[in-house]
UniProtKB/Swiss-Prot annotation:
Homodimer. It comes from Cupriavidus necator (strain ATCC 17699 / DSM 428 / KCTC 22496 / NCIMB 10442 / H16 / Stanier 337). It catalyses: aldehydo-D-ribose 5-phosphate = D-ribulose 5-phosphate. This is Ribose-5-phosphate isomerase A. GO terms for molecular function: ribose-5-phosphate isomerase activity. Its EC number is 5.3.1.6. Belongs to the ribose 5-phosphate isomerase family. GO terms for biological process: D-ribose metabolic process; pentose-phosphate shunt, non-oxidative branch.
Amino acid sequence: MTQDELKALVAQAAADYVKQEVPEGAVLGVGTGSTANLFIDAVAAFKERFAGAVSSSEASTRRLQQHGFKVLDLNEVDEIPVYVDGADEIDASGAMIKGGGGALTREKIVASVAKRFVCIADGSKLVQTMGTFPLPVEVIPMARAAVARKLQALGGQPRLRMTKEGGIYKTDNGNVILDVAGLKIDDPRGLEQAVNQVPGVVTVGLFALRGADVLLLGTGDGVQRTDY
């Protein structure tokens, strides 16, 4: 199966999961990225079951609205039973690197509110040690150079994210992203805490302190489920 076929397979499995596990009338948490987009498309078939959805990005909000979902502001919501999102890498403990799509801060906020985080990914995303995928760090623009020096001191090689057109990439929050290569992440929780303490960092794309509760992994043998 191709990677796109695996993504579609796991997106449908996630839709089946929320149909079974999320009570009618509840609010659904929705992530960002190519696999999350396929999940939105799949879950739209029974969108009337939900009171609405909380989205982690402007892009996902638009896709949800195109399908007729009511998109709610997180400030209006007391409880999210399940948040479904992809990952750029995930390890055996359920810790993840996220943020390849640029929505890491809002993803982390929505995930922190959710009772369960369901990670959906194709088999290539499951790794023994994270760090091959450059670690995204969202940064206040004025602190870009100062934060880059701190990340270099931690052993990383930060690079400012650019758009395809050659401009500086800006997040939905108006900030910039440093993508940090060269890190072998042996202690995800410790590194998440260390980077988050650097002045000027909004958040780091390590989801270890609040990792996945469930992994739905698309493989050539079908969808494998892991509970953490």
